[in-house]
Amino acid sequence: MSFDIAKYPTLALVDSTQELRLLPKESLPKLCDELRRYLLDSVSRSSGHFASGLGTVELTVALHYVYNTPFDRLIWDVGHQAYPHKILTGRRDKIGTIRQKGGLHPFPWRGESEYDVLSVGHSSTSISAGIGVAIAAAKEDKQRRAVCVIGDGAITAGMAFEAMNHAGDIKPDLLVVLNDNEMSISENVGALNNHLAQLLSGKLYSTLREGGKKVFSGVPPIKELLKRTEEHIKGMVVPGTLFEELGFNYIGPVDGHDVLGLVSTLKNMRDLKGPQFLHIMTKKGRGYEPAEKDPITFHAVPKFDHTSGVLPKSSGGLPSYSKIFGDWLCETAAKDNKLMAITPAMREGSGMVEFSKKFPDRYFDVAIAEQHAVTFAAGLAIGDYKPVVAIYSTFLQRAYDQVIHDVAIQKLPVLFTIDRAGIVGADGQTHQGAFDLSFLRCIPDMVVMTPSDENECRQMLYTGYHYSDGPCAVRYPRGSGTGATLEPLASLPIGKGVVKRQGEKIAILNFGTLLPEAAAVADKLNATLVDMRFVKPLDTALILQLAGEHDALVTLEENAIMGGAGSGVNEVLMAHRRAVPVLNIGLPDYFIPQGTQEEIRADLGLDAAGIEAKIRDWLA
């Protein structure tokens, strides 16, 4: 879409933060209004993360107005809320390409702009990076400021508290802004807090506070009285005791939609020394009523007509793998009251909404705490319950030590249901599920299964749930099934594959949901086709049989080639001294950027035509 200057006259003046800082302060509310409308118009046409950005318009404008970005470092946590930041930092006219192949990255990305200090996508990393940036600036004596913006969800993660604990110890010059959009404040309390925030962030208060500490430091009773008086004054309206105890100077909560008030408070705070904490209250979806009423649904949106306020419904075709999992979970829980389901803040995405309503006493959303989720599951297993950890492939990476140390070493029967495995699509490098087979396959006593369709997925979930000799993992992709008939549930023989087609000379060993593409190629090449089903334990006998009956083997998986299922096949052949040529097809050795799943698979040669071409080129 082209930028309409007449529709956004103030925003038209701002294509960089230098231009933003030339505006008179009185024009900032109008700029915020235009920025919010432009964001609504753009994202509704292109798709993308939506409600979070609507809630951070005023904060974004105020931060770039007060701080000398990009010299001063502004770090966004996760990045869902950073679309206004992109618009104000030279990417206004490209915002309609966000999350698309060759377009703007869905999150702040270092390779895209000097304003994007830290590439993000996963949560709770900003404060740690901010401390490092602040310490580096102090070492170089550059008078550079560091600011981190973190949401009320991300700050619940342990990594954020680890960082704040460290900051309280080493006292870097750092501002942490908590964007709190989970609760509202009344006008009276809000006005009082806004006034108090400007008072407490002012130089006079800061000078008196530090001066008083020095003067009365040798008089313990008076020093204690001053401390208690300050705590009582702040405690009347401030919920910041925790952050004060961690060593931060806490200011807030303040109205995050009052851009002029934010500018005043941030100007006061900019030159304060040591770790500072600004708590702002915002409304997710601000300015667009449907998103304000239902911020979860409008968190990320497809293309839609924003004048109607209605998102397009799904075509109602084949069920997604997430729904297949959710249905199995409810079905199993109805028969077994030992089942306990755990998710780290991914209820909707993992297909657990219905389960959470039907079995609330057995549903545990542990928030953004993947490490805790896994060890919590270990404890449930020790207590003779049957935990199911529903987690995205990319987020399981964050709990790798817990999978090994707290579950696998102890052979605890925990079932990991790994959603978004393989190519995810529009969220790009940080969200592709490229590595789970590689990092799980090397763990002793771990069973790893790769279903080829929704029926096999159900059978594997059943198999893993009833397996008692250690942990199991079932990995499945984002997207819909194939329309396979759902058969009665039964346990599969552990570590056994199935020959789907008998051919000659070449055998294709498929791991996962690329089976339809593999079948099309096998028909063209008259190749044997095998649904391997298990990455660990591998069907060694079948691999050796195929090696003896064919001139060459081809392995196929939607996981990194390095260390993946194909590597396991290679290891079997080498261990048994079978000198048969093997072609490993999978994800290449680089981080895969955004695009649709179809676009990415075509680019990587993982559609039927690409797989056939790879095999023919290899055989030539």
From Swiss-Prot:
For this protein, what reaction is catalysed? D-glyceraldehyde 3-phosphate + pyruvate + H(+) = 1-deoxy-D-xylulose 5-phosphate + CO2
Which InterPro entries does the UniProt record give?
A: Dxylulose-5-P_synthase, THDP-binding, Transketo_C/PFOR_II, Transketolase-like_Pyr-bd, Transketolase_BS, Transketolase_C, Transketolase_CS
| Key words, A-Z | Isoprene biosynthesis, Magnesium, Metal-binding, Thiamine biosynthesis, Thiamine pyrophosphate, Transferase
Cofactor annotation comment: Binds 1 Mg(2+) ion per subunit. Binds 1 thiamine pyrophosphate per subunit.
| Pfam families the record matches | DXP_synthase_N (PF13292), Transket_pyr (PF02779), Transketolase_C (PF02780)
Cellular compartments per GO CC = cytosol
* SMART domains from the UniProt entry: Transket_pyr (SM00861)
Which residues make up the binding site for thiamine diphosphate? H80, G121, H122, S123, G153, A154, N181, Y288, E370
Q: What EC number(s) are associated with this protein in UniProt?
A: 2.2.1.7
- Broadest EC class? transferase
Name the CDD domains for this protein: TPP_DXS, TPP_PYR_DXS_TK_like
Cofactors named for this entry: Mg(2+); thiamine diphosphate
Known Gene3D superfamilies for this protein? 3.40.50.920, 3.40.50.970
The molecular function terms in GO held by this entry are: 1-deoxy-D-xylulose-5-phosphate synthase activity; magnesium ion binding; thiamine pyrophosphate binding
Its pathway, per UniProt, is:
Metabolic intermediate biosynthesis; 1-deoxy-D-xylulose 5-phosphate biosynthesis; 1-deoxy-D-xylulose 5-phosphate from D-glyceraldehyde 3-phosphate and pyruvate: step 1/1
User: What's an example GO BP annotation here?
Assistant: terpenoid biosynthetic process
Any idea which positions bind Mg(2+)?
Answer: D152, N181
Q: Which family would the database say this protein is a member of?
A: Belongs to the transketolase family. DXPS subfamily.
UniProt xrefs under PANTHER family: 1-D-DEOXYXYLULOSE 5-PHOSPHATE SYNTHASE-RELATED, 1-DEOXY-D-XYLULOSE-5-PHOSPHATE SYNTHASE, CHLOROPLASTIC
Per the entry, what this protein does is: Catalyzes the acyloin condensation reaction between C atoms 2 and 3 of pyruvate and glyceraldehyde 3-phosphate to yield 1-deoxy-D-xylulose-5-phosphate (DXP).
Subunit structure, as described in the record? Homodimer.
Q: What is this protein called?
A: 1-deoxy-D-xylulose-5-phosphate synthase
Q: What is the protein's species of origin?
A: Klebsiella pneumoniae subsp. pneumoniae (strain ATCC 700721 / MGH 78578)
What's the encoding gene here?
dxs
